[in-house]
Regions:
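Membrane-interface helix-loop-helix junctions at transmembrane boundaries of multi-pass membrane enzymes
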Residues: 2-9, 167-168, 207-223, 281-312, ...
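Active-site lumenal/periplasmic loops and adjacent helix-entry segments of GT-C-fold
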Residues: 11-154, 397, 401-406, 429, ...
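Transmembrane catalytic cores of multi-pass membrane glycosyltransferases
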Residues: 29, 36-39, 136, 144-145, ...
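Extracytoplasmic
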Residues: 106, 145, 250, 293, ...
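Hydrophobic/aromatic-rich transmembrane helices and adjacent perimembrane loops
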Residues: 146, 190-191, 321-356
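Membrane-interface transmembrane helices that cradle and orient dolichyl/undecaprenyl
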Residues: 153-171
Length: 756
């Protein structure tokens, strides 16, 4: 179908789409007041490290400080904008990213027009890119260097197809952009090279048969341009290469960090069906080349085919022992796939409009074809933004995505400013993912953030994230690889303790049951007067911990006017059970009648003999409570999420109640199998296959002292305020509607019980 739109009108519409793209993206970014995305804080911490310390390879704030392997091209450009204009980082960063994201619209238009001389495909491609969900998500989660790098790759591929530019100018532009790309984003550089190097080889192969001198020169010109680009970036590459090698030696990218490897496999693997589906547009470009240009293997068809297939196949690189966030590789496929859809739509419109000649008088064919093309194009442009197609995000979906990635509003940013102004410059913070990245970036304080391992890369970040997640959630963790026991300590009645069982279906252990000190109740007589005491109501006296090569345990003692209460939690290194004992010592003229436990369970309860089982079919795990010498009366509540244990004591002497709580992976959901498994479980039965069996112990007091943590900051909607308010080791220093900040009282940590 011949061109139906004049070049000047076509370019005017493309500029209008570019303008629309800017306005739409600005609206999404400003919809939350502050730009959405945790990575905005990360980028600002890199900018501050460059401006204040002049260091490209170290981030002095992010994840407690350490190596920074985020290439600084975007950050240097943005810091120049900030210094030149005086605008803050949270304004400069998204503005730069919005500009480059919108330039992708023009790149889509120019690439499609240059590659295939079709009437409306370039405009459809530009419109689709303007509303591309994947590009918008990348902008809204703060992947600004990714946005810039993808735009540069599109611009580079456009230069590859420009044959009317002088060789000298082409080499200059390609080498400059290649060098800039290397300086901006490492993963994009790697994908770019994996596309370009096969392209050079294929061009060499097919240029031998070509009679055109330009075709024979192109591989050499492209190879020279890439080489010059590397020479431009060589000083940076020489400086950053040792840092890469050192971190790769520690397991980065090669699966050496087990936590990252497991999390990536469980959450970031791209389905093979999606990879196979991407082959359709990849090889279709060759078919389009045959129809619209003649030969099958033209430069344009080879380029677009490689552009689609290479990133898709790279998502399966875990087969070869290479690990990264594989979903990010899918962003490289978006542009060629959208161009494919635009070409397909143009082809379909042309096919339908040509069909009207069978239904129309000869003198009206051109007029009717034009009307049909206009109607069908309008329908496509209406369907894209207002449909629920997963590749596009109209206004409704766009604002939903922006809200999903929203991290800070005015109250949160007020707290960040307070941190910057009111805390020592060397104070170390612990915070949650997202908000914590803003604390490090805009509060300019070293911050350990509780980020999930699949979103981390550099080895030192994993321990920092694990420490932060644990400190915000629990005070003590006892983990032997089979079970994990968490306890909030004696100041806060919530999980006292919680038992989690390792699951095959999750990277995190699955919570199966927990007790609460406020629901462990002692019924007793003081003289002739009946009384009731919840364990949490008895003042905490001391917390002691003990570690050996075989086990770890926590001992908490409480004293009331009538009773002394001691709770002991012990985990052995190769057992699937935790020993929980409670000793109640009545004082003079006091006798204990009953002790009641409420056990919260996460699954179906099964009771027989001296044991209670808890089966969670979704997680494929089973928990178990085994009673000691005395067997309580067991009552299941109607909602089946709680079990009541009542011990009939009737004694004025010391009382000791022993429970073994544990769990195991259920290989079958068959009722007979489960009952047999529960009946055969003993303390020593479950063993770790590895000879390296050990028990890991997390003590919040020791960790905070060792790492010199000064403040805990978190959103009130994310973590318990009461957990820190009740603990004398923390002092509330800032509170608003959204955020709480606690100062760590080091002296209180040292005074509390014994550590280790």
């Amino acid at each position: 179908m011949k061109k139906s739109i004049s070049a000047s009108l076509e370019e005017l519409i493309a500029l209008m789409l570019f303008t629309f793209s800017i306005i739409y993206r600005v609206s999404l970014v400003l919809s939350c007041g502050y730009p959405p995305g945790p990575d905005v804080g990360l980028h600002n911490s890199i900018i501050n490290s460059i401006i204040l310390h002049g260091d490209f390879l170290r981030n002095y704030y992010h994840m407690g400080g350490g190596y920074s392997l985020t290439h600084p091209g975007f950050h240097i450009f943005t810091s120049s904008v900030m210094l030149a204009t005086g605008i803050p980082g949270y304004v400069a960063q998204p503005l730069v990213a919005i500009l480059f994201s919108s330039l992708m619209v023009l790149c889509a238009f120019l690439l499609t027009r240059r590659a295939w001389n079709m009437p409306i495909a370039p405009l459809i491609a530009a419109f689709m890119v303007a509303l591309s969900r994947y590009d918008l998500e990348m902008l809204l989660w703060g992947g600004y260097p990714n946005v810039v790098a993808l735009t540069m790759i599109s611009a580079l591929f456009y230069l590859f197809l420009m044959e009317d530019v002088s060789t000298k100018m082409s080499i200059t532009l390609i080498s400059f952009l290649t060098g800039t790309l290397i300086f901006t984003h490492s993963l994009s550089t790697l994908v770019y090279l994996c596309i370009v190097l096969p392209l050079i080889l294929l061009e060499l192969l097919f240029s031998v048969k070509s009679s055109k001198t330009k075709n024979r020169r192109f591989p050499a010109k492209l190879a020279l341009s890439i080489s010059l680009g590397f020479i431009i970036s060589l000083p940076f590459v020489i400086k950053v290469l040792p840092a890469y090698l050192e971190n790769i030696k520690m397991g980065m990218f090669v699966g050496g960090i087990e936590e990252n490897k497991e999390a990536t496999i469980l959450t970031r693997i791209v389905p093979i069906s999606l990879v196979l589906a991407s082959l359709i547009p990849g090889f279709s470009f060759i078919a389009f080349s045959k129809k619209y240009s003649g030969p099958l293997f033209l430069r344009v068809s080879l380029l677009f085919c490689l552009w689609t297939i290479v990133p898709a196949l790279a998502t399966q690189s875990f087969i070869f022992g290479l690990y990264t966030d594989f979903f990010r590789l899918m962003h490289f496929i978006v542009m060629p796939v959208l161009i494919f859809l635009a070409i397909f739509a143009d082809h379909g419109i042309g096919f339908i409009s040509r069909g009207v000649k069978f239904l129309t008088k000869p003198e009206n064919v051109k007029k009717v074809q034009c009307i049909f093309s206009l109607i069908l194009t309008t329908l496509i442009l209406l369907i894209v933004p207002f449909s629920s197609l997963p590749m596009f995000a109209g206004p409704s979906s766009g604002f939903t995505i922006a809200n999903y990635y929203h991290v800070v509003s005015s109250p949160e940013f007020q707290s960040v400013q307070w941190i910057k102004e009111k805390t020592p410059a060397d104070a170390i913070f612990v915070s949650e993912h997202g908000y914590g990245w803003w604390v490090s970036g805009f509060g300019e304080r070293p911050t350990l953030s509780g980020t999930d391992p699949q979103f981390l890369i550099i080895p030192h970040e994993f321990e920092a994230a694990r420490t932060s997640r644990t400190l915000l959630d629990s005070n003590f963790i006892l983990d032997n690889g089979l079970i994990e026991v968490r306890d909030d300590g004696g100041y806060f009645a919530r999980y006292n303790p919680m038992l989690l069982v390792k699951s095959e279906y999750s990277m995190n252990p699955h919570p199966i049951l927990y007790l609460n000190d406020s629901e462990i109740t002692v019924f007793y007589n003081a003289g002739q007067k009946p009384k009731i005491l919840d364990v949490s109501a008895a003042p905490l006296k001391d917390i002691y911990t003990k570690e050996t090569s075989e086990s770890v345990e926590i001992l908490m003692t409480r004293n009331s006017s009538d009773l002394g209460i001691t709770k002991n939690i012990r985990v052995i290194k190769d057992s699937g059970f935790c020993n929980l004992s409670i000793i109640i010592q009545p004082y003079d003229d006091v006798s204990v009648e009953y002790v009641r436990f409420i056990v919260h369970v996460n699954g179906k309860t099964l009771q027989f003999g001296r044991t209670v089982g808890i089966l969670n079919e979704d997680a494929g795990v089973c928990g178990q409570i085994i009673f000691g010498d005395s067997i309580p009366t067991v009552r299941r509540f109607t909602d089946s999420q709680c079990v009541e244990l009542i011990y009939n004591i009737g004694s004025s002497g010391s009382i000791e109640i022993n429970l073994a709580i544990g769990g195991f992976i259920a290989k079958s959901m068959n009722e007979k199998y489960i009952y047999n498994a529960l009946a055969n479980m003993t303390y020593a039965r479950p063993k770790l296959a590895s000879e390296d069996a050990s028990v890991r112990f997390f003590d919040y007091r020791r960790v905070m002292l060792e790492k010199g943590i000064s403040f805990i900051a978190f959103k009130r909607s994310s973590y318990s305020l009461e957990k820190f308010m009740r603990n004398p080791a923390f002092q509330l220093v800032f509170l608003n509607d959204k955020v709480a900040i606690f100062k760590v009282r080091t002296s209180a940590l040292k005074e509390e019980g014994s550590i280790g």
